[in-house]
From Swiss-Prot:
Highest taxon above the source species: Bacteria
Gene: prmC
Enzyme class: transferase
The protein's Enzyme Commission number: 2.1.1.297
UniProt keywords, alphabetically: Methyltransferase, S-adenosyl-L-methionine, Transferase
Source organism phylogeny: Bacteria, Pseudomonadati, Thermodesulfobacteriota, Desulfovibrionia, Desulfovibrionales
Keyword S-adenosyl-L-methionine found: yes
Sites where the protein binds S-adenosyl-L-methionine: 127-131, 150, 179, 195
Protein known as: Release factor glutamine methyltransferase
Molecular function as annotated in GO: protein-(glutamine-N5) methyltransferase activity; protein-glutamine N-methyltransferase activity
């Protein structure tokens, strides 16, 4: 879009040019992307575009819109362009330091809420990223509190912002650390939740450009196999969970059998280890419950 030709641009005209540009760039859902970017750039609702398609747009707004569309045409995720992503009915700030929350992780939240005992409970969210798991758990239940871990200081700052945004910051502690960070007493938690990096090096090269070229590699790839963090998470969860405490850990849809096998050294300490599926019917996360024995 040529900024010099935008002095009399209308909403529908901008939308048409943006859609054509995004179609040419082979971006997913080009019309929807154009509408969302236009609403973001002009602080509009989508209904405003429908009701006033011939509204004249100021040149400065046209230029801003054109710049944002150009970013989308490179494959940059829409969530990074508008600065947020919806998760479990709430908007979360995201940026290139954080993984963009995925819908399949919402099933982990649902399982946690269904499985936790009533009354006050404590959890850890290891590899918190945007904080979507930790913040959502606290927002859904006022009697939950927890610790959110991440190695990325910018990600922790984003997660802390999201906690304040949704009014749960007083029940969350944000700490820089990895999956081996032992900050908690043995037997002190009711839930260990984690969506760790689990993409293998081979899988990474085949990811879409939106993921591979823009989302933080460290939040996606732990090493050659994709399972490099899993054993450490299981060991730490075995230590810090109370009797009947729950481990929920997300993984890749082809990793279920390998993930379950990592519990073998701790088989006497877990009363239940299950591979759970997401709403698409794909293996997606481990559900495990500690027994009464101490490690």
């Amino acid at each position: 879009m040529n900024p010099a030709s935008t002095s009399h641009a209308t909403l529908q005209g901008l939308l048409r040019h943006a859609r054509q540009r995004l179609e040419a760039a082979e971006v997913d859902a080009p019309r929807l992307s154009a509408e969302i970017i236009l609403c973001h750039a002009l602080s509009l609702r989508r209904i405003d575009i429908m009701l006033t398609p011939d509204r004249i747009v100021e040149e400065a707004d046209c230029i801003l819109f054109s710049e944002l569309v150009a970013r989308r045409a490179t494959g940059e995720p829409l969530a990074y362009i508008v600065g947020e992503k919806e998760f479990f009915g709430r908007d979360f700030a995201v940026n290139p330091s954080t993984l963009i929350p995925r819908p399949e992780t919402e099933h982990l939240i649902e399982t946690a809420l269904e499985s936790l005992r009533s009354g006050p409970a404590r959890f850890v969210d290891a590899g918190t990223g945007s904080g979507c798991i930790a913040v959502t758990l606290c927002a859904e239940r006022a009697d939950l509190s927890g610790l959110a871990l991440d190695m990325s200081a910018p990600a922790l700052a984003t997660a802390s912002h999201n906690a304040r945004r949704h009014g749960v910051a007083q029940r969350l502690a944000f700490v820089r650390g990895d999956f081996t960070t032992s900050l908690l007493r043995s037997g002190s938690l009711d839930l260990y939740a984690s969506n760790p990096p689990y993409i293998s090096e081979a899988e990474y090269t085949g990811l879409s450009r939106e993921v591979r070229d823009f989302e933080p590699r460290s939040a996606l790839v732990p090493g050659d196999t994709g399972l490099e963090h899993a054993a450490a998470i299981i060991a730490e969860a075995t230590r810090v969970l109370r009797p009947h405490g729950i481990l929920l850990m997300e993984f890749g849809c082809m990793q279920g059998a390998d993930m379950a096998s990592l519990f073998t050294p701790y088989s006497t300490l877990w009363e239940m280890v299950e591979v759970r599926r997401d709403l698409a019917g794909l293996d997606r996360f481990i559900f495990a419950r500690r027994n009464l024995l101490q490690p």
